[in-house]
Amino acid sequence: MSGSGAMLLGLLILVAMATSLDTREICWHQSECDDPNEWCCIMGTSYGSCQPVCRP
């Protein structure tokens, strides 16, 4: 395996670990949240995350 390939693999593993730690669902619309008490909070970009309270 080349150096750049190993680096890319390591990066993918880091991203996978980071996303698995974040238990919030990624959403685009309120209806995508499994919990009816949660809102789809848009985080400055096009998608958001399901949270009970949206912080500014």
UniProtKB/Swiss-Prot annotation:
Known role: Probable neurotoxin.
Domain remark in the UniProt entry: The cysteine framework is VI/VII (C-C-CC-C-C).
GO molecular function terms attached to this record: toxin activity
Localization in the cell: Secreted
Protein name listed in UniProt: Conotoxin Cal6.41c
Primary localization class, coarse: secreted
Species per Swiss-Prot/TrEMBL record: Californiconus californicus
Record keywords, A-Z: Disulfide bond, Knottin, Neurotoxin, Secreted, Signal, Toxin
Cysteines engaged in disulfide bonds, as pairs: 27-41, 33-50, 40-54
Signal peptide boundaries: 1-23
Tissues expressing the protein: Expressed by the venom duct.
One cellular-component annotation, GO: extracellular region
